[in-house]
């Protein structure tokens, strides 16, 4: 990647803590969602968690994708299809088959769920391939970021158009990690101020799961939104 050097970094406990917090947030938000909490979309904790948790996951994924992006496009597609897509397929087949046998719930018993299940892994796969394709064509990070963001705009399936900016944010996070670490207090303070200022305007109905950015319809492939969302 032009203009950047790669640093041999040891495991950072900061990211382990960050991922643990994000996972706990997802679990709690899903409890509010699936346990029938009334008006969960307006619940303050649900609103707070859904304001940041999936962008955070994608930014962290972008951060850790930097070295994998040095593979060729074919190698990257092969490696990540095994690590990201195969679990989606196998988990979906097991869950749908099991549910059809025991009839535990009327959800997750349609094979169309294979399109939407574990959507985040599919979104990450597409983001990586789009970014790698753009990098292969341009050999320039800024141009690649712009091209992949434009490519992602019409791709609302798996919320790719929503997630792509955060994937690139994670890549920039990696390359400018020393600067970010030095300015962490200022960055966090500014981000917190913006969060507080924008909070009154934010609502659960504004999430990408309820109001996705769409330029065309893929209705035959759609799953039913937040009710079936995995995050």
Task: Show which residues each predicted segment covers.
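Alpha-helical transmembrane segments and their immediate juxtamembrane cytosolic regions
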Residues: 1-231
